[in-house]
């Protein structure tokens, strides 16, 4: 079995690089593979999505497409409707999320995170918010993390 892993924009995969050069030599119908990828990733429009194409049997051209969960940063940016994070996190704020928005992103990433419970998942997403320069209910995400750990905020 041959596996081709790549990142594509949701619903906008093309037969060009990186998919074409990787899958072309395997003899697959690139148009059909791209159509299948776009169908499976259309809900992630505007976000980079990890995709794996497993060529199960090159002789029969049988393949499967596995779509991963977009990076936490992409989900946060989509949720807030922002293009990119703050370039200088200390001086500039890229956006402000509500705790509910953070929980929503944590829920959608739950299967891909290392956390055992929702509280841990929320703490991980808050870590990404720090990196992007996103505040949570007007507070620094690190402050919100401390409040959750101290039991001041229930998840």
From Swiss-Prot:
<dbReference type="InterPro" id="IPR020784">
    <property type="entry name" value="Ribosomal_uL11_N"/>
</dbReference>
<comment type="similarity">
    <text>Belongs to the universal ribosomal protein uL11 family.</text>
</comment>
<comment type="function">
    <text>Forms part of the ribosomal stalk which helps the ribosome interact with GTP-bound translation factors.</text>
</comment>
<dbReference type="GO" id="GO:0015934">
    <property type="term" value="C:large ribosomal subunit"/>
</dbReference>
<protein>
    <recommendedName>
        <fullName>Large ribosomal subunit protein uL11</fullName>
    </recommendedName>
</protein>
<keyword id="KW-0689">Ribosomal protein</keyword>
<dbReference type="InterPro" id="IPR036796">
    <property type="entry name" value="Ribosomal_uL11_N_sf"/>
</dbReference>
<dbReference type="InterPro" id="IPR020783">
    <property type="entry name" value="Ribosomal_uL11_C"/>
</dbReference>
<dbReference type="GO" id="GO:0003735">
    <property type="term" value="F:structural constituent of ribosome"/>
</dbReference>
<comment type="subunit">
    <text>Part of the ribosomal stalk of the 50S ribosomal subunit. Interacts with L10 and the large rRNA to form the base of the stalk. L10 forms an elongated spine to which L12 dimers bind in a sequential fashion forming a multimeric L10(L12)X complex.</text>
</comment>
<dbReference type="InterPro" id="IPR036769">
    <property type="entry name" value="Ribosomal_uL11_C_sf"/>
</dbReference>
<dbReference type="GO" id="GO:0006412">
    <property type="term" value="P:translation"/>
</dbReference>
<keyword id="KW-0687">Ribonucleoprotein</keyword>
<keyword id="KW-0699">rRNA-binding</keyword>
<dbReference type="InterPro" id="IPR000911">
    <property type="entry name" value="Ribosomal_uL11"/>
</dbReference>
<dbReference type="GO" id="GO:0070180">
    <property type="term" value="F:large ribosomal subunit rRNA binding"/>
</dbReference>
<dbReference type="Pfam" id="PF03946">
    <property type="entry name" value="Ribosomal_L11_N"/>
</dbReference>
<dbReference type="Pfam" id="PF00298">
    <property type="entry name" value="Ribosomal_L11"/>
</dbReference>
<keyword id="KW-0694">RNA-binding</keyword>
